[in-house]
Structures are given as structure tokens and as C-alpha cells.
């Protein structure tokens, strides 16, 4: 679990494919703070028949270091670096309790849903973390840029979600949030969602004045980052069977998705023969596998043919219904990063506006007096076929799915209501739970930096 000299987070989790043969001791920051040292260690184990992969997490707190354009020594990333990183790190964590690392409003100003559970600090500090180089969508775009310069793509990874609670207990439900680690944030008062008592607030102010803040003439505890934490997240894996071997292989091939805590399921395929696919067929998924590539894969250019994308999202029956399915595209134009969010499926029989690429409002609301939600609004599942209206043949790009639920009360609002308080005005009262797929890359390149064990 290394960090930079500026306290930028560079934590990784290492997953082994099996348990029959394991290293005697793990690699840690006592060995090196350089992630490249970890990869060399993993490569060495692989030569001994010990297969593993590493998953970076909390990139949002890396202060731009997780997805830099340079290596540890400050040299420009090259093909060898890209191949080594992708060989060892095919996945990245996109959401967890310490914030979501999809994107940031500063990076995606035209994405209305970018400001979701943003954790603005470097991990375990009060220092700000810069956005460029810290968020996953930006990393995918950076990967296109390095590949365009013939230096390979070190950021062609899939996504998972995780909890990072260190307790084997994940606080995934907004209405049942119990914090990250109980000794720190087990009560609404400690995590800053309700005003501190006079006694507790006074004691903290006397001993740690920076750990108290005033909001609308009310005193709240301000322990580092607690108010920004989220009830997240979950890793989704499409494996042939529920075995360690099958799940590991799915992780390795990046057939994975993430959710912010609810149990949404999402499928994503792309191909040149999917435009006639029958969305009602019981053989839809087998047809998609035969006719295209799935999340985490690369669709090769086929002359000027326009690919068709298949998305299928299923709601968690115990939470809010689905509001919309989106496909997010990233590409380079004259060397500049470009992105576009397309709504591709709307709930309640609504249709996407072809000019704005947005679904109309489906009318889903939340009553902040008791957190009740508008009834009979939303969809239990959404599936569709879609083609990119701005498709340019041969233009390198990535596409990934984001699924949005109807709004619900955030955990901090539930805390306030149950304590007889008003929700904090400086925190979001509601959120939209969501899921993200791993991308599909559209590419003319024959070198995709994929390593399949």
C-alpha cells in the first residue's frame, strides 16, 4: 500500500488465481513504494507458476499520480511500461466507500452526473487531490493518447467496485449505512451528518479545532473525509460458473462491472452483426457472444462498418427502479480529449431526444420529510440496440455503459431524518445509485496490450 512523497494514494490489492502455490511473504511498501517494483515481483512469481493480478484503488486520492503520463522515475511512458502494467493490472476500482473515481466535474463539465460521491482529499489527509490523473475516464483517454504516440496503452483496464471497509462488512445501503470502521465513524454525530452535541463539539474544538466546522450556525464534526464517504461498492463478474478459477479468468479478461452499492446487473456487447438481434429472444446473450465482443474487449475496425452496441440492465429488486441507460464515449480529436454521454434507453416508455441525447425527466422524486419515493416510476430492466450517431470509421475510441437508478436519499439524509434534524445543506440530499461496465474499445490497432493467462 504505497503512496507518493506528496501523500498521493497508490494502493493496490493483489488477487491470486489459486491457493495451491503462494509466495512466502507478500509484497508491501517495506519492499518498495514504486508500483513497478510490485509488477516485477508479480512477473517473477508468474515465472514460478504463481499467477496474480493487481487492482489499483482509491485513484481519486492519488493527487494525479495513479494515471500519470510518466513512470516512477519521471520518464515518458513507453511500450514496455504499458505492456508490463497491463500484464499485471487489467482492472481498476471505480467506486468504493472513499468516493467514486469514474470522473470529476472539472474533467467532465458537460456530464450532468459527474458530481457523484466525489472524495476531494488525498487518502487519510486533509490535503486536496487534483483531478487530472486521478479518475478512470480520464485515464482511458490518456491511454488513447499514449497509444497514439506509439507508446502503448497502459490504461486499457476494466472496472470493479469494492467496499474498502477493512472489516469484511460492506455498508452498501443508503438507509442502513453504518460507516467504514466503527471506531471512527459508527454514529451520525461522528461522521458529521448531524450536529455535534454541545459537550462533544466543545471537547473536539478544544483538542482538535480543525476537526470542527460551522454550517448554518450549527456545529459539525469534521473528521477527515467522513462526510464524503459513500455507501459503496460492489464488483460484478460475468463468469461461466461460481468457482475461483472461472471468476479469476473473468477478472483477467475484464468481463466485469461495478455498482455503487445496489445489485444492478449490466450486460454490454458490440459487433457488426448485432443490428438485427432480437431483444426478446431467449438466445440473445449467446447470439451476442457469437456475433460480437463483450465488456472488456476490443472491437477491431472492419472497413467503414458501423458497430451496433447491445446494452441490457436489470434493476436491484430491493432498491429504486432504473431511470436510464447511458453509453459514454471517449476519443481523441486533434490530440485533445473528447467525450460524449449518450442516453440510449429511457424508462416509462420515454424516448431519447436526438438533439440533446437525453431522456426526458421521468418524474421520479424523493420526499425529504421521510425519504419516500415516487411510486410506479422507473423500469425493472432496460435493453436496447444502439449505434453511435457521431461514429467516425477508424477513429480510436472507448465506450462504456453507465446505468442510473431513480433518486433516493443519501445516507447522510437518512441519518438526519432519523435524528430529527434537517439534512446538511452542504451535502447532497439525494443521489442516483448506478452501475458502470468495463469499456469496449474500438480500434484499428493490432496491439491491445491484453494479457490472458
PLM-predicted stretches and their roles:
Residues 1-15:
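Hydrophobic or amphipathic alpha-helical targeting/insertion segments
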Residues 2-3, 27, 31-63:
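Structured catalytic-domain cores with a bias toward divalent-metal coordination
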Residues 6-10, 22, 46-52, 58-73, ...:
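C-terminal functional module detector
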Residues 11, 17-33, 37-39, 107:
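Binuclear metal-dependent hydrolase catalytic cores centered on His/Asp/Glu-rich metal-binding motifs
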